[in-house]
Amino acid sequence: MSEVFDSKSFLKTVTSQPGVYRMYDASGTVIYVGKAKDLKKRLSSYFRSNLASRKTEALVAQIHNIDVTVTHTETEALLLEHNYIKLYQPRYNVLLRDDKSYPYIFLSGDTHPRLAIHRGAKHAKGEYFGPFPNGYAVRETLALLQKIFPIRQCENSVYRNRSRPCLQYQIGRCLGPCVEGLVSEEDYAQQVEYVRLFLAGKDDQVINQLVSRMEQASQNLAFEEAARLRDQIQAVRRVTEKQFVSNNGDDLDVIGVAFESGMACLHVLFIRQGKVLGSRSYYPKVPNGTELAEVVETFVGQFYLQGSQMRTLPGEILLDFPLTTPELLAETLTEIAGRRVNVQTRPRGDRARYLKLARTNAATALTTRLSQQSTISQRLTALAQALHLPEIKRMECFDISHTMGEQTVASCVVFDANGPLRAEYRRYNITGITPGDDYAAMNQVLRRRYGKAIEESKVPDIILIDGGKGQLGQAKSVFAELDVPWDKHHPLLLGVAKGSDRKAGLETLFLEPEGEGFALPPDSPALHVIQHIRDESHNHAITGHRKKRAKVKNTSTLETIEGIGPKRRQMLLKYMGGLQPLLNASVEEIAKVPGISQALAEKIYYSLKH
């Protein structure tokens, strides 16, 4: 316990009401956030002579100050606790690493509704279906829907400015509501209603309506229409057979738990209307000495209460671990959802099988993760030994990418003890230098990255410079001139140069620009981690450069093609539905655009591709 903090005097002032407390260290940083039904009773437990765990002992030893916020109810305290955890990211709390919002399928409220992928707050008028576990699952579903129910997916800016149908209409993926006379209002509205029912899990209603229409078409001798409806029915049935899990129309989140060697995996299975939308594994950041009960309770709280306004809550949550206060979580989620949300930890029947599936997935994912972590840990230990460092907690690596000096991009990738920290990867657009001057580019990115205040925990142990002696010299000169509050002498600057034939395993490492380099054995784990972070940095830079180059190229290439003036350019973009469909189109598809000959289509195709 910190000598600076007078716990006895503090506890005399604490109320017994529900609320949230924030613990600070000597630097004023929030190190822990907690909630309590009885603040006095809970906070007193931290200052007993026999504490529950080493983690608690380490926490209490750093307490310099405690702030308390009283709430009316325990539910308010629970919500406020998770808002504070999200805000402060305290190092002694279990932290959910991935907090980005989940994607939904959005059906707009326009006169001719469109389908789109959506993340974030639900401000736009329309209907939202989901959540889906990732963007890929949404895009796959949208592609499927487009084949079965051809309603538009184009942006309103494209839709409002069309005079001819685009390629999507030509290949049967859109009914073409943008052009008058191609589809009746009733037919388009019917397809929109099918989409709405399908996404709501009411597949039987869709099939029954389609069967009824097919029979009516047959009676009217409209055999082409009947055949089209038959194909649509078969497509819907194929999809629903693949997705089917339960005939109860369940809306469930099923959470399996695995915990080993201080690492936790929580695998969430998303089931909506009896269909599996997908699943996802989460690996929360777990402070040393944390009990599994705290990991699970904190994860569940953060998962559902942080950003809850953007999440569609299920009717039921199945959990592979008993919570101490499941009623509190259920009441809080019920209040947020405006309807009953149940939390079950001992389900039976089909629900028990769902939970077993989630548990198996969690265990498998954790085993894979631990294996990867073990490899990364061994490699970092070997590198620390090779460079005579006590340990390596954080590494950063820089690379430069450009084409003949144009669209120069610098990348910075970050590794910690667990491997790549992709959320902290950064790209920097380099400007104001002589084209092709890699030294100036490196100088600029290092000044932008390190010429400011940095948290102590974010100061890297190693800064890897891809490029050898010259680039290392730039790094040394930048660091010599830095005037910053953090210890600029802490990072080890390490240059890496590829061999003459640029083969992996022939890299030369430099600690000084003027000194001799040294090489590590090709089978060295230390070399493997250097290759890993360097390749990550290179790929990150290349990807950023290509995106930047493509943006410039694609906006200007059409203007440079002989025979393509403003009118034809506008016609191409309108007819194809925008630049991206044009980039993906074949010569034959481009030649269908009015005013574009076969020869001109070939010229356009090759100009855009090369």
UniProtKB/Swiss-Prot annotation:
UVR domain mapped to chain residues: 204-239
Subcellular location: Cytoplasm
Main location (coarse class): cytoplasm
GO molecular function list: DNA binding; excinuclease ABC activity
SMART domains cross-referenced by the UniProt entry: GIYc, HhH1
Keyword Cell wall biogenesis/degradation among UniProt keywords: no
A GO cellular component entry from the record: cytoplasm
GO biological processes: nucleotide-excision repair; SOS response
This protein's record includes keyword Cytoplasm: yes
All copies of domain GIY-YIG, residue ranges: 16-94
PROSITE patterns the UniProt entry points to: GIY_YIG, UVR, UVRC
Pfam families linked to this entry: GIY-YIG, HHH_5, UVR, UvrC_RNaseH, UvrC_RNaseH_dom
Keywords, comma-separated and alphabetical: Cytoplasm, DNA damage, DNA excision, DNA repair, Excision nuclease, SOS response
Family: Belongs to the UvrC family.
Classification via PANTHER family: UVRABC SYSTEM PROTEIN C, UVRC/OXIDOREDUCTASE
Function according to Swiss-Prot or TrEMBL: The UvrABC repair system catalyzes the recognition and processing of DNA lesions. UvrC both incises the 5' and 3' sides of the lesion. The N-terminal half is responsible for the 3' incision and the C-terminal half is responsible for the 5' incision.
Summary of subunit composition and partner proteins: Interacts with UvrB in an incision complex.
Protein name: UvrABC system protein C
